């Protein structure tokens, strides 16, 4: 059903924001492949912004993110671009679509305690365009 939701949102020009598995679904839908990774379960790491994004100014303020995943993108689908990587091992941590308002990140903003104001701002800016 996830693909049907993506297709509906794309057909109706709705924004799509995916966190963790949500990013993986977006990436898979657009033809990305995955590899197993280590040291990304219940850990934290720094991210490095690598691509252009309308959210770059906010992403640059998010230095350290949580990590709860076993898989990372191996080959990124053609319609997507890398926005951020893990500073430790260069795994892709954030992506966006080249033509549609579709953004994905591997970290969980809802698992931060207290909430990170820059994660909150990223989500607000995304949906308020």
Question: Where do the model's predicted regions map?
Answer:
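Soluble or luminal CAZymes and related metallo-dependent hydrolases
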Residues: 1, 87, 118-122
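Cysteine-nucleophile active-site neighborhood
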Residues: 1-54
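Active-site glycine-centered loops adjacent to acidic/histidine catalytic or metal-binding residues
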Residues: 20, 69, 108
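A generic structural signal for well-ordered coil/turn residues at beta-strand boundaries
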Residues: 41-43, 91, 101
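Catalytic beta-strand/loop cores that center a nucleophilic Ser/Cys/Thr
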Residues: 53, 57-99
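Active-site-proximal beta-strand elements of phosphoester/diester hydrolases
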Residues: 103-107
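Acyltransferase
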Residues: 109-129
């Amino acid at each position: 059903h996830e693909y049907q939701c993506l297709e509906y949102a794309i057909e109706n020009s709705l924004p799509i924001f995916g966190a963790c598995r949500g990013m993986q679904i977006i990436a898979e839908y657009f033809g990305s492949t995955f590899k197993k990774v280590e040291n990304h379960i219940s850990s934290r790491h720094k991210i490095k912004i690598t691509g252009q994004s309308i959210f770059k100014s906010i992403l640059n303020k998010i230095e350290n993110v949580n990590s709860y995943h076993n898989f990372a993108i191996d080959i990124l689908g053609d319609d997507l671009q890398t926005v951020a990587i893990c500073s430790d091992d260069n795994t892709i941590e954030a992506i966006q679509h080249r033509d549609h308002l579709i953004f994905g990140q591997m970290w969980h903003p809802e698992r931060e305690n207290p909430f990170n104001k820059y994660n909150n701002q990223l989500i607000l800016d995304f949906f308020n365009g």
